[in-house]
Amino acid sequence: MVPKLFTSQISLLLLLGLLAVDGSLHVKPPQFTWAQWFETQHINMTSQQCNNAMQVINNFQRRCKNQNTFLRTTFANVVNVCGNPNITCPSNRSRNNCHHSGVQVPLIHCNLTTPSPQNISNCRYAQTPANMFYIVACDNRDPRRDPPQYPVVPVHLDRII
């Protein structure tokens, strides 16, 4: 059991290490602010199964996203992380708007196993649950479209550690 657990943890870390690479390849749909898109991609897991939850994201992007991590917490809790001290963003060393969660949260990582370019509803994902820390990038809210109760909002899931 120990070798299997160790191997699966290593595999998860390797998959999550690619998160920053995959995240840089997409563009926010125009109907969303960056905070709304963050919430859609990383908080609002519409189903307990990756195959179904990823359909929401894939429909907006019109492609099978290679991987995605859903934090099993609330948007308000992630907003609170934005109040933690600023750190350099691991995925972009020129940015200093990242914040470490300070506590581990349950999460579900979805990794594309079966792409389906012709029919994105047929994309299939492996699902890996874990409890991990996260690093999130935060920016000032969009004053026209984000709710005023959060002046600073999460805009990018930078790293899972």
From Swiss-Prot:
Query: Per the record, GO CC terms?
Result: extracellular space; lysosome
Q: Which residues form the active site?
A: H42 (proton acceptor), H156 (proton donor)
**Residues bearing attached sugar chains per UniProt:** W34, N44, N86, N92, N111, N119
Q: Which keywords does this Swiss-Prot/TrEMBL entry list?
A: Disulfide bond, Endonuclease, Glycoprotein, Hydrolase, Lyase, Lysosome, Nuclease, Signal
The molecular function GO annotations come to:
lyase activity; nucleic acid binding; ribonuclease A activity; RNA nuclease activity
Query: What Gene Ontology terms for biological process does this UniProt record contain?
Result: chemotaxis; defense response to virus; innate immune response in mucosa
Which superkingdom, per the lineage?
Answer: Eukaryota
Q: List the disulfide bonds.
A: C50-C110, C64-C123, C82-C138, C89-C98
Q: Report the subcellular localization.
A: Lysosome; Cytoplasmic granule
Family statement: Belongs to the pancreatic ribonuclease family.
Quaternary organization: Interacts with and forms a tight 1:1 complex with RNH1. Dimerization of two such complexes may occur.
Which protein are we looking at?
A: Non-secretory ribonuclease
Native species: Pongo pygmaeus
Chain's gene name: RNASE2
